[in-house]
């Protein structure tokens, strides 16, 4: 087995752009500190909408060119964050973006939402046993906001964490490995409320006409739920640049951004988490690896 860095972080996301919006500052920080940062993206995001008019030819109802284009956007975003280890679950295009909940895309051939759970988890087990992460970051059971691919990414990540530690599960995938800490992406409600209060004052000077609402932000929870706070302020520019790299999906204007709905949101540079498995390193962690042995 090759030598591994002392700290190893695995993030599991549904589509290209989710990682930069949710964890961009965290990823940039740990990459800069020399930790192994591995991102697994479950689909190519083929069903996303397209913001720039100049790229309208990529819309999903045309030649199915959006997914491959977003692969390039993701590569550019990873360069901005300093992350060199990125994989697609099962390989690029193995699982397809399922579209929004209730749509016909949920059940089309290859849709991630319709994937066999243990088969999909097996692809992730291979990654876990290879890179041996101490920390896993993914979504909560609702996927943050109910998107089928986000929910499925949560299910696959949690199942893979279980199976990777089981010696009886597919020994050909490598030596069993137990992940020490599992986190869900979160945003504390007071932080979101303060961010939107600032946004409402600043909105007339932005390129956006309207603001989203606090509850439009995935993963908003009461402050008491938060266990971990990662100050990504030194990496704010890297996070913003990574989000800009996802130009089909995200529009950034200073400390604000919008998705294809054109509703402005705050761009958070401090990122928050809920520890759901493993020992908390301190009452309010400031490092995902607190209490973790190399």
Swiss-Prot record:
Binding, Zn(2+): 15, 18, 150
Gene Ontology molecular function terms on file: N-acetylglucosaminylinositol deacetylase activity; zinc ion binding
Note describing how the cofactor binds: Binds 1 zinc ion per subunit.
Pfam families: PIG-L
EC number(s) on file: 3.5.1.103
Record GO biological process: mycothiol biosynthetic process
InterPro entries: GlcNAc_PI_deacetylase-related, LmbE-like_dom_sf, Mycothiol_biosynthesis_MshB
Similarity comment: family membership: Belongs to the MshB deacetylase family.
NCBIfam families: mycothiol_MshB
HAMAP family from the UniProt entry: MshB
Job of this protein: Catalyzes the deacetylation of 1D-myo-inositol 2-acetamido-2-deoxy-alpha-D-glucopyranoside (GlcNAc-Ins) in the mycothiol biosynthesis pathway.
Protein's recorded name: 1D-myo-inositol 2-acetamido-2-deoxy-alpha-D-glucopyranoside deacetylase
Top-level taxonomy: Bacteria, Bacillati, Actinomycetota, Actinomycetes, Kitasatosporales
């Amino acid at each position: 087995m090759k030598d591994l860095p002392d700290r190893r972080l695995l993030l599991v996301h549904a589509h290209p752009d989710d990682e930069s919006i949710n964890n961009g500052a965290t990823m940039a920080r740990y990459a800069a500190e020399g930790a192994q940062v591995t991102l697994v993206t479950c689909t190519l995001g083929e069903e996303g909408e397209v913001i720039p008019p100049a790229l309208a030819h990529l819309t999903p109802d045309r030649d199915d060119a959006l997914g491959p284009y977003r692969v390039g956007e993701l590569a550019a975003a990873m360069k901005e964050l300093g992350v060199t280890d990125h994989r697609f679950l099962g390989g690029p295009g193995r699982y397809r973006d399922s579209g929004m909940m209730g749509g016909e895309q949920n059940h089309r051939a290859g849709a991630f939402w319709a994937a066999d759970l243990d088969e999909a988890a097996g692809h992730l087990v291979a990654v876990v046993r290879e890179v041996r992460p101490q920390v896993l970051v993914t979504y909560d059971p609702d996927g943050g906001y109910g998107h089928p691919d986000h929910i499925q990414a949560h299910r696959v990540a949690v199942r893979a964490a279980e199976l990777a530690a089981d010696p009886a599960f597919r020994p050909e995938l490598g030596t069993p490995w137990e992940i020490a800490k599992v986190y869900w992406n979160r945003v504390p409600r007071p932080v979101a409320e303060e961010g939107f209060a600032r946004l409402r004052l600043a909105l007339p000077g932005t390129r956006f006409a309207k603001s989203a609402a606090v509850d439009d932000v995935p993963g908003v929870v009461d402050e008491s739920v938060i266990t971990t706070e990662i100050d990504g302020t030194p990496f704010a520019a890297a996070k913003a640049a990574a989000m800009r790299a996802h130009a089909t999906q995200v529009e950034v204007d200073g400390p604000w951004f919008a998705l294809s709905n054109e509703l402005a949101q705050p761009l958070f540079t401090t990122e928050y988490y809920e520890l759901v498995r493993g020992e908390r390193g301190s009452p309010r962690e400031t490092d995902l690896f607190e209490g973790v042995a190399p």
